[in-house]
Regions:
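Intrinsic-disorder-linked linear interaction elements in eukaryotic regulatory proteins
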Residues: 1-119
Length: 119
């Protein structure tokens, strides 16, 4: 059976993966999520929140507000803030999410016509 990596090894893997693929890559997100879980196990919720926030912001930037991954990462971030009893950060991140969501919905899509299509 494969041994579980140490927190330090996970952080090193995350930094290497982030450097190669970026922080919004699926592998980077999964490693950062594991780091977040480890910090939660140690009851270091401030560090867990830090990695959860990085993940959420990277997904929001790369995939947008309507992507299920972004929403799942937001839920994980809120859970970390709850464990840290940081109500202000919960309110802030939820307000930001809905503000961005509303802005996204307000973007007008130009009306297309068939006049410019060449056959």
């Amino acid at each position: 059976m494969k041994e579980k990596k140490t927190l330090e090894e996970l952080i090193q893997d995350y930094n290497e993966c982030k450097e190669i693929f970026g922080d919004a890559d699926f592998t980077s997100i999964m490693i950062a999520s594991s780091i977040c879980d480890r910090y939660c196990e140690r009851k270091q919720y401030d560090k867990a929140s830090e990695y959860a926030k990085r993940n959420y912001e990277a997904s929001l930037r790369e995939y947008g507000v309507d992507e299920i991954t972004t929403f799942d990462l937001l839920a994980k971030l809120i859970k970390c803030y709850e464990k840290a009893e940081d109500r202000e950060s919960i309110d802030s991140v939820v307000d930001e999410y809905y503000r961005i969501r509303e802005e996204t919905l307000e973007i007008e899509i130009p009306d297309s016509t068939d006049d410019d299509i060449l056959f």
